[in-house]
A protein has these predicted regions:
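Conserved N-terminal beta1-alpha1 strand-loop-helix module at the mouth
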Residues: 1-86, 141-143, 168
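Hydrophobic faces of well-ordered beta-strands that scaffold small-molecule active sites
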Residues: 2-8, 40-42, 67-71, 89-91, ...
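Active-site mouth loops of central-metabolism enzymes
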Residues: 4-25, 66-73, 100-108, 122-134, ...
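Glycine-enriched alpha-helix->loop->beta-strand junction motifs that scaffold or abut catalytic
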Residues: 36-38, 62-65, 83-89, 123, ...
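C-terminal helical cap(s) of enzyme catalytic domains, especially alpha/beta-barrels
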Residues: 60, 103, 162, 166, ...
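Catalytic cores of alpha/beta
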Residues: 74-85, 135-145, 189, 193-207
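Glycine-rich phosphate-binding active-site loops on the catalytic face of alpha/beta enzymes
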Residues: 90-98, 148-161, 205-225
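Histidine/lysine/aspartate-rich catalytic loop segments that bind and position anionic ligands
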Residues: 127-183
Length: 247
């Protein structure tokens, strides 16, 4: 069955706007669990302005849901991850500002650094995923760097301004998912997915996990997080049960 991971960045961002303890990331994880999420994604950025090591430890120790860290492949981040030993780590570019990076890692040009990070994480028994654009060369580089999974960056698909452009980007995701599986990599997809555009992605037979945050948290403002996660989960399961994705 296709998995869903709830990205907690917007929950942490809302907390950071006023400081203090609310909204509580652990309460969000409990609601996500009730809604059927399989894990939560905790982004730990260089500035630690949103989520930080304390949040990750708190969530990990709670055991409510498996924790996947989202980090840049720096020495400091890798050292923390190997000490925490979450269920998984997604290696991503460090954002330049407040917005998430609009692309995956350029694994081909940063192979040495990423390979070192992936090796240390794998040695600690952590599932290592590398965020990449849907590009054959990047997939080959991620495989060579020691990734066990790739998280295909769906940003261009999600931001497509026309249906023709959307189909073009979807086909790129589809080809990349198949190529990644042929390389022996597990396939995750994330970034920019909402309740509408996720159905094509979830119907791809090679996709094992979908991750999302913004659309789910936005809906949660009106329905509650439990119900918002459940609605996304239902959408994924229904789409994955279809025989073939709509091109």
């Amino acid at each position: 069955m296709i998995g869903f991971g709830l990205h907690l960045e917007l929950v942490a961002l809302l907390r950071a706007t006023r400081g203090g303890l609310h909204p509580d990331l652990l309460a969000a994880a409990h609601a996500a669990h009730l809604g059927g999420a399989d894990h939560v994604v905790v982004p730990v950025r260089a500035d630690r302005r949103r989520a930080d090591e304390r949040d990750a430890r708190h969530l990990q120790e709670s055991g409510v849901l498996p924790v996947h860290l989202e980090i840049a492949p720096t020495t400091e981040n890798v050292a923390f991850a190997t000490q925490l030993r979450p269920a998984g780590v997604v290696l991503v570019p460090e954002p330049a500002g407040d917005r998430p990076a609009g692309r995956g890692l350029d694994v081909a040009s940063e192979a040495a650094r990423i390979t070192e990070a992936a090796g240390a994480l794998a040695d600690a028994g952590i599932l290592v995923a590398i965020s990449t654009d849907p590009d054959e060369a990047q997939l080959v580089a991620a495989n060579g760097a020691g990734a066990l999974a790739v998280e295909l960056h769906a940003g261009r698909y999600a931001a497509a301004a026309s249906e023709d452009a959307r189909v073009h980007e979807f086909l790129a995701l589809s080809r990349s998912a198949a190529s990644a599986r042929a390389l022996g990599l597990r396939v995750h997809v994330g970034h920019g997915l909402d309740y509408g555009n996720v159905t094509r992605v979830a119907a791809l037979p090679d996709v094992e996990v979908v991750r999302g945050g913004h659309a789910v948290i936005a809906r949660a403002m009106f329905t509650g997080l439990h119900q918002a996660v459940a609605a996304m989960r239902e959408r994924l399961v229904r789409a994955a049960a279809e025989e073939a994705p709509i091109p």
